[in-house]
Amino acid sequence: MHAIINGRIVLNDKVLDGCALMFDEKIKGIVSRETLDAAWENEKCWQGKPLALTDACGAYVSPGFINMHIHGCAGADTMDAKADTLEIMSRFLVQTGVTSFLPTTMTCEMQEIHKALEHIREAATVITRRRGGKPEALLDEQVTAPEAETQKYVPARGVQEDSFTMQSGLPDDKLARGKNILPGAKVLGAYLEGPFINNAYKGAQKEEQIKTADFAFIKDFADVIKVVVLAPETLEQAGKVKDFIARCKAHNIIVSLGHSAADYGTALQAIEAGASHVTHLCNAMTGLHHRQPGLLGAALDTGVTCELIADNLHIHPAVQRMIYRTKGADGLALITDSMRACGLAEGVSELGGQTVYVKNGAARLADGTIAGSVVTLNRAMANFRENTGATVPEVVRMVTENQAQELGLFEKIGSLSPGSAADITLFDENFTILYTFVDGREVYKNPEFR
């Protein structure tokens, strides 16, 4: 059993002081410091289990962050689809407070996309179970690794090498993948950004590989794809839009509108058909005009969840404030959309076979087109709070609960409620990450913290 003491525990709408967070592999609850102190003085145990303590020293204690739109970091990119690609990303992300993520593909040859999806499938904690041919999304029941002998608590520095392995002898209908086969942040599934986009708003994606949306292209990976980006105007008839969205929803795939020239009416029809998400709001879409609201207007005028890249390059701070006041914290999901150069020194990098130049915190193609970001999620949180005045609980909600709710996983991740996975992040007032725990394991400690 583990307890975090002297921390400021971040809940949905408030911050708790003077309490301790109790957990093992799952969150056990929040207790008063007096209750914990009494147990420590008497037995140094909690509910009969040896108790280990982590002193937060006044830091914030929150659910682990969820980055639901990320192409790469630390030199790795989802489309590399190499044996160590997701491991590299997993190790780096916990240093930024991220405990779960959706590796994101981009427009390429379909066989390249499928190869990347296969790698994501192998690493994913979340899969799909089928009953009678009807898919049902779920977070697999956790397979508990053999319990280690109790040892004196010694915080690790950096990401721990040990990881849980897949267990055998599981029921065929569950296809359970065990707990987390990666050393750090968990893979929840895939985010498919392209090829179903509009070439007029392709951004840094390959025009020659763009395709008209067809569920047949992705049906064999419906178990692992959690989000698919759609430019609804590229489907000529409204019936095709509705059919594509309906098939995605039947497989628990979120349809996100983006990379799109859709007008307000077309976007609204797609939202009414079930599209519930918008990819990097303001970027790669029609802008807001008082006579032509476009996709941006439809996103602001409805209840869809809107992604935001708060690196202060993709969206001006003043516009971030406007969006925050319009959508509120519950309608926003902070993301990074980062590429492989995130976490590396500035210089020349690569995205989808294209040369990218990283300078002054911006990643661009030779023609000046923005090519993703190099921001980390904790830095985006700091920027957004500074730009908007959002509270710490609100900013945390935009990287935890909102994503978990939309992915249908809020009973499992994204909160500090009893029974949730013990994915926990500790950070200071500047959003510098101090500790990260995944499924109760300490996977990162800032070497400069005490």
Task: Give the residues covered by each predicted segment.
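N-terminal metal-binding scaffold of metallo-dependent hydrolase/deaminase domains
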Residues: M1-N42, F437
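Active-site gating loops and adjacent loop-to-helix segments of metal-dependent hydrolytic enzymes
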Residues: R91-L102, N199-V224, Q269-L281, Q292-T305, ...
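Active-site core of metal-dependent hydrolases
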Residues: K219-L344
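His/Asp/Glu-enriched, well-ordered alpha-helical/loop segment
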Residues: A298-C306, Y324-S420, I424-L426
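Divalent metal-dependent hydrolysis catalytic cores, especially in the metallo-beta-lactamase
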Residues: H71, E87-H119, A185-N198, A222-E233, ...
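Alpha-helical scaffold segments that flank or form the walls of functional sites
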Residues: A59-V61, M68, T78-R131, E141, ...
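C-terminal cap of metal-dependent C-N hydrolases
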Residues: G7, Q405, S415-R450
